[in-house]
């Protein structure tokens, strides 16, 4: 979907095409959100753990980075699971309504 659709074009889509388009947009938004979260966490961990410039990481810096990223990934996995559960509940609720 490289081209941008105008409102009139969107109105002409079938309900199935609209669902497909919305699903694709949601998927792209989720990917972008995940990328931004990973970038943010990486920057935070680097800022927290790397205290002085050098040609190599010290053992303390490596451990700090590992722990920081582990905590981030654990938190991210929990948040993602909760979001997936919520989306599934909303889909199930919408399905029951139709």
Curated annotation (Swiss-Prot):
Keyword set, alphabetical order: Chaperone, Disulfide bond, Membrane, Metal-binding, Mitochondrion, Mitochondrion inner membrane, Protein transport, Translocation, Transport, Zinc
GO MF annotations, alphabetized: metal ion binding
Membrane topology: Peripheral membrane protein
SUPFAM superfamilies: Tim10-like (SSF144122)
Record's function text: Mitochondrial intermembrane chaperone that participates in the import and insertion of some multi-pass transmembrane proteins into the mitochondrial inner membrane. Also required for the transfer of beta-barrel precursors from the TOM complex to the sorting and assembly machinery (SAM complex) of the outer membrane. Acts as a chaperone-like protein that protects the hydrophobic precursors from aggregation and guide them through the mitochondrial intermembrane space.
Gene3D superfamilies the UniProt entry points to: Mitochondrial import inner membrane translocase subunit tim13 like domains
Gene source species: Brugia malayi
Localization in the cell: Mitochondrion inner membrane
Disulphide connectivity of cysteines: 45-68, 49-64
One GO-annotated biological process of the protein: protein transport
Domain characteristics, as noted in the entry: The twin CX3C motif contains 4 conserved Cys residues that form 2 disulfide bonds in the mitochondrial intermembrane space. However, during the transit of TIM13 from cytoplasm into mitochondrion, the Cys residues probably coordinate zinc, thereby preventing folding and allowing its transfer across mitochondrial outer membrane.
GO CC aspect terms: mitochondrial inner membrane
Motif (Twin CX3C motif): 45-68
Family statement drawn from the similarity comment of this UniProt entry: Belongs to the small Tim family.
Classification of source organism: Eukaryota, Metazoa, Ecdysozoa, Nematoda, Chromadorea
Keyword flag Zinc: yes
Descriptive protein name: Mitochondrial import inner membrane translocase subunit Tim13
Zinc keyword on record: yes
Record note on quaternary structure: Heterohexamer; composed of 3 copies of TIM8 and 3 copies of TIM13, named soluble 70 kDa complex. Associates with the TIM22 complex, whose core is composed of TIM22.
